[in-house]
Amino acid sequence: MPREYPLERTRNIGIMAHIDAGKTTTTERILFYTGKVHKMGEVHDGAATMDWMVQEQERGITITSAATTCFWKNHRINIIDTPGHVDFTVEVERSLRVLDGAVAIFCAVGGVEPQSETVWRQADKYGVPRIAYVNKMDRMGANFFEVVRQIKERLGANPVPIQLPIGNEDTFQGVIDLIENKAIIYTDDLGTQLAEAEIPAEMLDLVAEYREKVMEAAAEADEELMLKYLDGEELTPEEIRAGLRKATIAVKVVPVLCGSSFKNKGVQPLLDAIVYYLPSPVDIPAVRGINPETGDEDFRKASDSEPFAALAFKIMADPYVGKLTFFRVYSGVLKAGSYVLNSTKGKKERIGRLLRMHANHREEIDEVCSGDIAAAVGLKDTHTGDTICDEKHPIVLESMEFPEPVINVAIEPKTKQDQEKMSIALQRLAEEDPTFKMWTDQETGQTIIAGMGELHLEIIVDRLMREFKVEANVGKPQVAYKETVRGTAKAEGKYIRQTGGRGQYGHVWIEIEPLEPGKGYEFVNKIVGGVIPKEYIPAVDAGVREALESGVLAGYPVIDVRVTLFDGSFHEVDSSEMAFKIAGSMAAKQAVLKANPVLLEPIMKVEVVVPEEYMGEVIGDLNSRRGRIEGMEARNNMQVVRGYVPLAEMFGYATDLRSKTQGRGTYTMHFSHYEEVPKNLADQIIQKRQGK
């Protein structure tokens, strides 16, 4: 079957923004103008198409990134809507990995908020080309030029406005297109009636100045244009667009547009800009991977004739069709009903049906081609970050890294019947979300769930009740402490039982040493000459792992250590995997105790926005919470305080801040890193855990 849309006319884009910058409304308008939605949904009616989980409609925030296809001027645009709340950074990270370009939405009043910085850095990490859209130009306090300045200074980007607003706040009536050098006025409420007009006389100088900047940015990307520009010749709109496209795809400039999505102004030019400036799958470099059979680096170009390779980036439980696996095809073609290899797990899987998603309804399709985003039904073992590919040409694409959860709560089902339902439901939610973890506490037998923040866990508990009908009691949030070692130590583990019949014999010597933060756990086998047979080595590793998982000081997992197995002995008859696992576990506990173990706690990056008069009190309060103030700046009549504070001190902060600032202060925080707990506090925590 021939392609409906050639690759060059495909755009895979994400929409990224701070909470409340108007992301879902903008997406909704895009779907309206591209003809996919016949009546626009408003977020504050709880009817927006992209927000299709009940929790999202109630809270007016977007949690899951729904992937939607729409069409504009003979191009297919796949939009991935990403959440803006810090607790959901995993969703953003996950979608940026499979996008080719992004639209960053900023609020004309709030400008670059802390969350925008986080998301922007994530996009930098993946080298995603972006265009910026300054929304809410009709709001009190809207200031387009201030937002452009902040994009340059706070995000370190190179913003190039390709539009200027006509009017401001309630007089905002349209935009000036700097490329075509004309004014566009919106004449009706739906924003479908556009009238071209003369540029207002009082804006001519400003327009000339900014048009010059646009031409310069376009010329810098292309030598021919540069020569023409330096000769003082006027560049044509087509030439300017071609130059800007090159510069945007090379992540050298960020074209900036403006509008008011809620008032339906500025959305069609934004769609044009997506088509003009953001890359198609052909414009980005071939995707890198590893051939699992040879271990060599391999590449896949965006082409239907290459072998099939795709990355699963989201799993969702759908009430009607079961488990949906969203994936991005990097190369080749996949037909419904065919077999693929999950090269990450080395398992063969069958694709049942293929679906193209529109925010809340789905269309069944026969095949997907390179560059497309679709959902598959029938994949049993494929999780987020797995590669699926043609089994004759295996490749493992670079996966994604997800942060470890920082906050735990105990959860108990209200009735016996709920017990089984709860564990199935939690299992399913953990499949969907790699930053959500669950386990059973060995000492208390309680089920513990862990996530990236209080809101994250609230929504998980909410989904348990609604989707899986599980009633549960939830404990108080606890901090996810960790342990590590500061020194190096050797220890012996000997497990010998030889009393009649088959005995047990496992004997190991290990050395433990600290790794730099964030490196996790590393196991090195330095056994030579077969003092421990090869088949027992994995058992030693498993035993060490188990001991480190359950902690030594206070029962918290030990992280960032390297364990080296360097000696030991075995018995021809009595040795077994079990014996070596126990010996490994015994040695690990001893080694940690000898190597100066310490307790670590999660440190959060906190940003508090308060009116000037509450500044002193807020800083004093953060200091009393063991906070380190990093810096302060003024922003729109408010003061912004930035710092790092231990998570343990931040519980209930929202309420305290409200009462200290009479409801006018706001804050955001997200996980930054782990740090050693001060000795006096560590001793208290350890004693409490040991029940002294």
Swiss-Prot record:
PROSITE patterns: G_TR_1, G_TR_2. Its main location: cytoplasm. The keyword GTP-binding applies. Pfam families: EFG_C, EFG_III, EFG_IV, GTP_EFTU, GTP_EFTU_D2. It is found in: Cytoplasm. The keyword Iron-sulfur does not apply. Disulfide bonds: none annotated. Keywords: Cytoplasm, Elongation factor, GTP-binding, Nucleotide-binding, Protein biosynthesis. GO terms for molecular function: GTP binding; GTPase activity; translation elongation factor activity. Residues 8-282 form the tr-type G domain. GO terms for cellular component: cytoplasm. It comes from the Bacteria. Belongs to the TRAFAC class translation factor GTPase superfamily. Classic translation factor GTPase family. EF-G/EF-2 subfamily. Catalyzes the GTP-dependent ribosomal translocation step during translation elongation. During this step, the ribosome changes from the pre-translocational (PRE) to the post-translocational (POST) state as the newly formed A-site-bound peptidyl-tRNA and P-site-bound deacylated tRNA move to the P and E sites, respectively. Catalyzes the coordinated movement of the two tRNA molecules, the mRNA and conformational changes in the ribosome. This is Elongation factor G.
